[in-house]
Amino acid sequence: MKQKIKIIQTIIFIFFMSFPFYANAMTVEEIIKGRKAMFSENYQNGKKISILLKSKKLEEAKPLMKKISDNYKKLLDYFPENTKEGFKTEALPSIWENKDEFNALMQKASDDMIKLAKAIETAEDLRAVQKELMWSNCTACHSRFRAPH
């Protein structure tokens, strides 16, 4: 009997841990504002990375690339069904209609930032590699999943 209880407790624990606690505990407003803040932070860090790469300050740019990568992973949990509208969201319905595609793009953007941190060590054209591995992901997402502004 004790073993059955432990198994049930374990299943319940795994079930609840499979959902990101912070996203479940937040209000719709907090989720929408949180994702907007992360995207804004990514953009600001992207601009800083451009400046640092232009100045050949590669090592200073790498932590910003890691931060952007981490934000993209976190953003996967910031688009629950109940956050399609409100609080000046610019997210289009296509996010939820094509959730797998959107999630794949967020994961690719995250992975590409890690690739960028490695690629800058040997790249001859830093601007081109940044465009390929960073800005092109922004463009791909905005053109498909963000309202024009």
Predicted regions mapped to residue ranges:
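Bacterial N-terminal signal peptides that target proteins for export
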Residues: K2-I12
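N-terminal signal peptide c-region/cleavage motif recognized by signal peptidases
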Residues: S18-Y22
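Boundary of Sec targeting at the N-terminus
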Residues: N24-M26
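Sequence context surrounding c-type heme c attachment/ligation sites in exported
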Residues: V28-H149
